[in-house]
Swiss-Prot record:
It is found in: Secreted. It comes from the Eukaryota. The gene is PER58. SUPFAM superfamilies: Heme-dependent peroxidases. Glycans are attached at residues 36, 210. This is Peroxidase 58. GO terms for molecular function: heme binding; lactoperoxidase activity; metal ion binding. Its cofactor is heme b; Ca(2+).
Amino acid sequence: MGLSKTIPLVLLPILMFGVLSNAQLTSDFYSTTCPNVTAIARGLIERASRNDVRLTAKVMRLHFHDCFVNGCDGSVLLDAAPADGVEGEKEAFQNAGSLDGFEVIDDIKTALENVCPGVVSCADILAIAAEISVALAGGPSLDVLLGRRDGRTAIRADAVAALPLGPDSLEILTSKFSVHNLDTTDLVALSGAHTFGRVQCGVINNRLHNFSGNSGQSDPSIEPEFLQTLRRQCPQGGDLTARANLDPTSPDSFDNDYFKNLQNNRGVIESDQILFSSTGAPTVSLVNRFAENQNEFFTNFARSMIKMGNVRILTGREGEIRRDCRRVN
């Protein structure tokens, strides 16, 4: 498959706009207007994660699903409000019933509004919360840049089109990333976030029990013993909302075991395993490098997170600073 795609000319104005806007983001954006923003967010995430070991992965996923749909503008947090032109990305089938962690973002926003009202955007709260969550799980320091503003709409159909799916081919995955000026290294590094968290059985049901439309058949790329483990966790005809660990080796730690699992054909989601199973693809060597060297994975993940966090941002007078992350002002 052709993985190094030429970016269509129609996308260049969007990408150029993103580059120009990124220059307005800084690591110390709130140093005078809300200097305790990170400390406040960290305290609330630490407290919430003591009661929910999965929280850090949930928050990381929120940030990813925000940035991949029309940029990092906090739109994923908006509840559906048709009168305000908000369809709600939460209702996209990739998100419905599985996207979580909204409550801790609400708590952070409430706390910040009490000390520095109208200053910190919900989009930035997501970026800060993702940074903290990765660190709490043992991952690298991200040093996120700040200064985003919040969008005023959310479009369900855009979320359906933009977000990766479990059965996506490598070509489709690469295309979905390249739209955001994210390359193959970004694809593999960011996929490494599946080193923690869970997946609903509905996402992998066909891979385990109905692969390529063949009833009773499974994806032949799954290591046989691991297949039986997954089938016990997600039996045919079972609860599709039940969950399986994305990284069965160290499910709640941010490390490079995800890539080692791929090498052993123990990737849980088809679009994860395909990074290693696609013979001759440049993703294979990246999986091998990250499996061998955790520091190299951490370095590339941090770089890719900053890059993703700058996708089609709103700055200056664009958008707004929401008072409530769930609704527009």
